[in-house]
Each structure stands twice: as C-alpha cells, then as structure tokens.
Amino acid sequence: MNTQQLAKLRSIVPEMRRVRHIHFVGIGGAGMGGIAEVLANEGYQISGSDLAPNPVTQQLASLGATIFFNHRPENVRDASVVVVSSAISADNPEIVAAHEARIPVIRRAEMLAELMRFRHGIAIAGTHGKTTTTAMVSSIYAEAGLDPTFVNGGLVKAAGVHARLGHSRYLIAEADESDASFLHLQPMVAIVTNIEADHMDTYQGDFENLKQTFINFLHNLPFYGRAVMCVDDPVIRELLPRVGRQTTTYGFSDDADVRVEEYQQVGPQGHFTLLRQDKPAMQVTLNAPGRHNALNAAAAVAVATEEGIDDEAILRALESFQGTGRRFDFLGEFPLEPVNGKAGTAMLVDDYGHHPTEVDATIKAARAGWPDKNLVMVFQPHRFTRTRDLYDDFANVLTQVDALLMLDVYAAGEAPIPGADSRSLCRTIRGRGKIDPILVSDPAQVAQMLAPVLTGNDLILVQGAGNIGKIARTLAEIKLKPQTQEEEQHG
C-alpha cells in the first residue's frame, strides 16, 4: 500500500493517527488475527501473543507482525493499545501490565467497530452460519468489483486469508454474540441467521436475555439501515415485530421476501430457485452442500440485491464459491486396504460444527450428497458446559451416523463437569441401541481405531471446534493409514 492510500485510510478516523503500535493478546484466534491482518495492511505496527504457532500467526508474521509465544508483561511495552479476545482472563500478565502502564485495553469488537465506524458496515450475526455467510457476501461483492474489506472468523479459501483490506467503503464482518461484544458494532446492514441457546453463561442462563441482546444489536442499525433475517427460525419470527428497522426476510417459508424453492443436492453442490419480490427468479448453483448453505446464500443474495449488484455477478460468485476453512472442508479421497478382498476408498471431510444443530446440518448434507456412503464421524465435544446444557440433543444427533468415534471433551479452559464427559455421552448413545460408539482417549490412535469401522465406501466426518482440526489434517497427511510407533517417531 502506498503512502497516499495509507493516509486516506487513516483519515477515516483522524484520532487513530495517534495509535502506532497495536498489541493483541490471543492473536492466533481467527477473529483476532483477521482484525490484526487488516490493521497490519493499513500500516500499523502489530504485535501479539499466543501459546503456540498456527496458520494465523504465520500469516501475520509474514506481514511483519511481531509474535510472542508466551504471555509476559514486557510483551506490551510501547503498545498504544492492547486488544484482548474473550478467551483471555483478566489476570493475564499482559493485561495486568497494560493496566499498570495506563495503556487502553479493549475487546476485539471495539477495534472492529472502529474499522467499521466510517465505512458501510455489513455485520453477520447468528448462532450458526456466520462464517460461511460472511464469506458468501464477501465473494459476491468482490465478484461485482466492489473491492470490500472483510474480517471473518474462518479462512476464506478463495482468498487464502481470514481478512482482507479493500479500498472501497464496504466492510463485511462476522459479528460475535458469544460474549455480547457485537453490541459495539454499528453497521448499516445486519444479517441474523438464527438464534439458539448457546454461550448461555454470557447471558446468565436466560434465553430471554439472549433474545433481547440480539434486538439491541439490531437497534444499533440507523433508522435507514436494514436487517436481513431468516424467517424459518422460530425465534427470529417471534422477534420480527420488535426489530423496528427496515427488514428483509429469507428462508424456505412461503412468506419469506427471498424464498428458496426446489432445492436439490448433487454431491457437493446445491441447486435451487430463489424468488425475490419484484425481481426475476434466480436459478442458483451453489458450490456448497446442504439446505443450511442454501439459506446462507439466500441471506447473501438479499443483501446483494438491496445493494443493486448485478444478478450475473451474484450467480458467478455462488457457483464458484470455494467455502471456508473447516466448514465441510473436503480434504481428499484416499484408497483403503482391501476389505473382504475388495479395494475401496474413503472421503475425508473436516467440519467445525460443534453445536447439535450444526452437527445435524453436516450429517444431513453428507447423507443428501452421498447417500450410499458408510457415514463415520470422529467427534470431539467442545466445552463441558455446552455438553451439559445440550446433552440430550447431542445424543439424539450423534445416533444418525453409521459409526462414531468420540474424543474426550475439549475443555477450552473449563473445569470438568460430572456427567458431561465423553464417556457418559458414549454410554447414553450406546444405551439407545442404534450405534456402538468408540471412546478414543488418545488422539494419536484415531487412525488405528478408524480402520475396523471402514467398509471401503466411506465418508469420514471429523467434527468439532477444539484441536480436532489438527487430527483431520494428520489423517489426510498419512492418508488414513495407521502408523507404527517407529513411523510416528520419524513422522
């Protein structure tokens, strides 16, 4: 970026010129890293800390950011402001040091709000589908030549990054309700995909509190802004009279303003018709599987149509959509050792979904696209509180696969909760008599324990939000073949 471009960007918020060095605590998180990437490209000095390297920290280092793989007071030296993720506790040494040095400490969403303040902000909120919908909106705007800035919670595969600095007035961002910090945002357009009980510790266990927080978020829209909401969701339908802003609805429902009809899935693609008020019907080919992704696309089309984007650009973007990292992410199809004398293959798919509704949508997409496959899931529950609160829902959803391997709960810093562990969940599922789940206590043994349940015509879903994505990549690297101890040592 040249000096003139940088000066123009910094003039958006003149007071931000006083800020030179921005430090991120928990910089390896996708949402944090995305904002850091945009700011690095705007010319700010970026530093950050996390516990281990990952693709996000590697990308930031390539842009000149200083990354510390520890949390020490000296890491915040000379910082103008410290940005923290919701996963960081208040007693973190860097946060304590920043307070002592009277350095401002702000949450991620506050910095995102500053980026959005004088841009045309499009914020995508909801319990499920935020990341993919953000990527779809970004892809359509890019295809239309509008050069948007985007900040996403997952890797946008077409761009190879979580975030990108554009040179237009548009900023498209995923809005995080997990800590209610999306209330800092003041977008021009807001999408709400759905509302379900999740992150309930933030909302004192009160679902009414969660619903009111979404209403408060929508009230951050100016009176001339627009809410785009999925009317298929019963909670959203209930809340519509309280929105108080111009609203476009979408869904499979007959009364949706943007309506999905005639949905069919063929392999990884969805084919459907979109009906819009006072507009020609669109015949859509979407390069993403599942009815849930048709809904995500309908939301993106609703926003793009309101902006006046050409239908041909919309259709091109959806047909060529490359998806996001760890969202029904196809890692390969691998040959297997002959089973009963017959050679076969197994497809490997990595998916981030960790709420029962998300897991259910992934299973349905797999069944619809590959109905003859033996569906095997490797599942890692995420957080003891979520496992406890949604225990029966998990048990019901996970019985839909043909074979299930379950890893221990990924704690994400939580203390264990009796009865909300993987062993208990396996026992409950087994008691329902549909499948016999296998508990895998050692992640290194996944490939070995997979082998006996494969038939030679398999689709393996590696599912969860913890560190299970690394297991998926390892399975792809070894091509699903169990390794000997010697191979593991030399791998």
From Swiss-Prot:
GO CC field: cytoplasm
InterPro entries (alphabetical): Mur-like_cat_sf, Mur_ligase_C, Mur_ligase_C_dom_sf, Mur_ligase_cen, Mur_ligase_N, MurCDEF_pg_biosynth, UDP-N-AcMur_Ala_ligase_MurC
Superkingdom of this protein's organism: Bacteria
Catalytic activity line of the entry: UDP-N-acetyl-alpha-D-muramate + L-alanine + ATP = UDP-N-acetyl-alpha-D-muramoyl-L-alanine + ADP + phosphate + H(+)
EC number: 6.3.2.8
UniProt entry keywords in alphabetical sequence: ATP-binding, Cell cycle, Cell division, Cell shape, Cell wall biogenesis/degradation, Cytoplasm, Ligase, Nucleotide-binding, Peptidoglycan synthesis
Binding site for ATP: 126-132
Keyword Cell wall biogenesis/degradation belongs to the record: yes
Disulfide bridge partners, by residue number: none
GO BP: cell division; cell wall organization; peptidoglycan biosynthetic process; regulation of cell shape
Subcellular location: Cytoplasm
Primary localization: cytoplasm
Gene3D superfamilies named among the record's database cross-references: Mur ligase, C-terminal domain, Mur-like, catalytic domain, NAD(P)-binding Rossmann-like Domain
GO molecular function terms attached to this record: ATP binding; UDP-N-acetylmuramate-L-alanine ligase activity
Function: Cell wall formation.
Name of protein: UDP-N-acetylmuramate--L-alanine ligase
Organism: Citrobacter koseri (strain ATCC BAA-895 / CDC 4225-83 / SGSC4696)
